[in-house]
Amino acid sequence: MHNDCLFCAGATELTERFSNYYPNFDLRKAIFYQTDNFITTPDMYPVIGDPYLLLVPKMHVTSFRKLSSGYHQEIAKHLSAMDKVLNPCGEYARIMFEHGQNKDGNQTKSVYHAHLHVVYTNFCRRKISYRVMKDILSWDAIPLPMHEPSFMTALKEQLEVDDDYLLFSIDKVHLVVKDQCHSFPSQFFRVLLADLMGFQFINWKQANQWQLHILGERLNRLPLPLTAN
């Protein structure tokens, strides 16, 4: 555990943080799903209005690549729990991405604790796929197996332990891009999705009170988790 880490604090402090930033937020949604080693929680600063969650290991690691295969079934359990609430009929696209941070000093991301972004949307799958492919294919994206959680196993096989990377998934099609020259822009996929879907991109590092109000309205659209019923 790192005392200065946003995600090492645990479920209680995560819930308190939601309460401090968003007084009208239903705190039953703050911990969407929890198991022994992982927490699923809403992204506190969602860049779009569709359901936007983070899957976070409780132990302090800097990427999902560093997790042993013994955790992969637990990861799949969280994804299944999200699907049951947010996509029970399979009509929405499920988008996942991660900025995997393994090298010291690389500014790929601002939070040095692994977190997998999970988004559910009815926005056109073809447009999302086209835009992502257009932006990342020049970086030699590597396809991973479709079945879960085997794509996590393949992630370990395709990457060296100290590789930084981008992981992107839509509808169980998974791609990984190695960062060969420390060139990934900060918040790359967050900016891309907001721009593509027509949402105002709000940089969580600089959000003012009015922008926090907008983010709070986006958060309030999230349905209650199964544990709240």
Residue ranges with predicted function:
Residues M1-N229:
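HIT superfamily nucleotide-processing domains
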